[in-house]
């Protein structure tokens, strides 16, 4: 059911229909299934679009615990409860973290951005380029443009465009040269 219902939660979220998103999510819970991080993230996004701060942060705390529990349940038994996050699970919180950073910074909760970023970092999770972009936007909103520019310059990867590297540039829908008709 989750594969059917999670996209519906996301669709309602994008339209700002938080009550409808809640109803669909409740239908998922009524099936007896434990909602995945994907489903929880869809609901988190609905709360973000609705501007419901209490709901965003309550659900974020739950998402964070679920991610930690997921990592611990798949960790080797010998590694213990405080085992580091496995490499293949380090990105579990990337999307929900971006949602929380965006919401907190747009709400003027700049200290909360730092708090949640550090919480995720201490737990051993990784950040993706979207997280870093959201952090840059949050820093700019907090009037910390210099820090945002430092992240852009030193953290975000910069791959020059093909034309700058002397590579041939082709139209977006053109076939690659090796497969072009002769």
Language-model segments: what does each one mean?
Residues 1-182:
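A basic, Ser/Thr-enriched alpha-helical scaffold prevalent
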């Amino acid at each position: 059911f989750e594969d059917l219902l999670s996209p519906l939660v996301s669709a309602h979220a994008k339209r700002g229909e938080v009550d409808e998103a809640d109803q669909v999510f409740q239908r998922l819970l009524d099936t007896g299934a434990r909602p995945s991080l994907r489903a929880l993230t869809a609901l988190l996004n609905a709360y973000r679009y609705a501007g419901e701060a209490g709901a965003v942060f309550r659900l974020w705390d739950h998402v964070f615990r679920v991610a930690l529990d997921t990592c611990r349940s798949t960790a080797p038994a010998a590694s213990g409860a405080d085992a580091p996050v496995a490499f293949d699970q380090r990105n579990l919180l990337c999307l929900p973290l971006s949602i929380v950073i965006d919401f907190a910074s747009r709400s003027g909760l700049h200290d909360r951005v730092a708090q949640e970023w550090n919480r995720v970092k201490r737990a051993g999770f990784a950040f993706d380029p979207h997280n870093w972009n959201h952090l840059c936007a949050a820093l700019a909103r907090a009037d910390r443009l210099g820090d945002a520019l430092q992240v852009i310059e030193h953290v975000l990867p910069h791959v020059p465009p093909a034309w700058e590297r002397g590579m041939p540039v082709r139209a977006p829908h053109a076939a690659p040269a090796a497969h072009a008709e002769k």
